[in-house]
Amino acid sequence: MKRCVTFFLLLLAFVMQPFAQGNTCPQLLECEMQSEILGCTKRYCIYLPQGYSDENRTFPVLYLLHGLTDTHTAWRDKGDVQDIATELINDGKAQEMIIVMPDAGTTYDGYFNCDGWRYEDFFFQEFIPHIESTYRIIPDKQHRAIAGLSMGGGGTTWYAINHSEMFSSAYAMSALMGLVNDSWITRDPDARRRVFMESAVANNNITAVENATQEQRAKIASVRWFIDVGDDDFLFDNNMEFIKAMRQKRIPYQLRVREGGHTWQYWQQALYIALPFVSESFGE
């Protein structure tokens, strides 16, 4: 009888082992915080690497921005970020890092400050301080990076240009680099969409680089830049205009034009380049 009990306990321990180990595996959590600036609750997803189970360790952080019509769950549900990050870390191609995916609204809100939506203020005055005081993050420029796709690529670029003291690197995928003011924007019957379009005009990354002073240029150049856009992307020309401005100002950058369009398949593959790239910045 004693042998049977011993065998049963050993078998139970063997069966339960994967569940016990699951607590130390990489996790992707969905959380929330209250914003006084926006006057609402904002949700976010956060990837915690395997090493986060060691309470004595701290980690670099990547803020990963979604695109238009999506939310904080897009990189989790469509971008396969957890599996790709874990694969790259396990293969030694990327550092262990915390990846934070904020919510910039579902449609036509975005990452800029505009009437009734001070998202840029929220991001830097509330969101980053909340994240970096809640989780074990190394809170300095060298260990902080930003990346994003489409609208989030534009937000990535704008934030890295105007808050260069915050980020060691910026990786813009299929980015909306800016819009030129046109009568069709002011005639748009959708007021919410019109506000978003007007904010994209006011926060034009191309113009920001073109008009940069020598002091501003030096700050922008303190960020390691990577522009990634597909040869079939409708924003290809928009990205080439940004590259032209960077070249004129002699700001170093890396450019990758790959086969593909404005698709999740493209952005999933971009992560295989983005995470090693920001990891190199963390190590500098």
Regions found by a protein language model. Give the residues of each.
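Bacterial N-terminal signal peptides
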Residues: 6-15
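Positively charged n-region of N-terminal signal peptides that target proteins for export
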Residues: 1-4
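Non-catalytic cap/lid and distal C-terminal segments of serine-dependent acyl enzymes
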Residues: 21-284
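Sec/Tat signal peptide C-region and signal peptidase I cleavage site
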Residues: 16-20
